């Protein structure tokens, strides 16, 4: 599913958490994704070589932590 991570109104927080979790990412990398989850996963996969499933799992954990 192509979820827009900006709809939560927390895109800046999400970007910060993603950059902490995957230190090789830049603001430009994340801005290129336009907040689209599938694009975020793609950029992380491209930069790190992690599997999409592993990235999705970690991203879910980060998003869940932001909701608390």
Name every feature range the model reports, one short phrase each.
Residues 1-68:
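Intrinsically disordered, low-complexity, hydrophilic segments
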């Amino acid at each position: 599913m192509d979820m827009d991570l900006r709809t939560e109104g927390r895109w800046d927080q999400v970007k910060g958490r993603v950059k902490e979790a995957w230190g090789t990412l830049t603001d430009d990398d994340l801005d290129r994704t336009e907040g689209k989850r599938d694009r975020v996963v793609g950029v992380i996969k491209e930069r790190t070589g992690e599997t999409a499933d592993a990235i999705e799992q970690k991203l879910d954990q980060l998003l869940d932590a932001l909701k608390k």
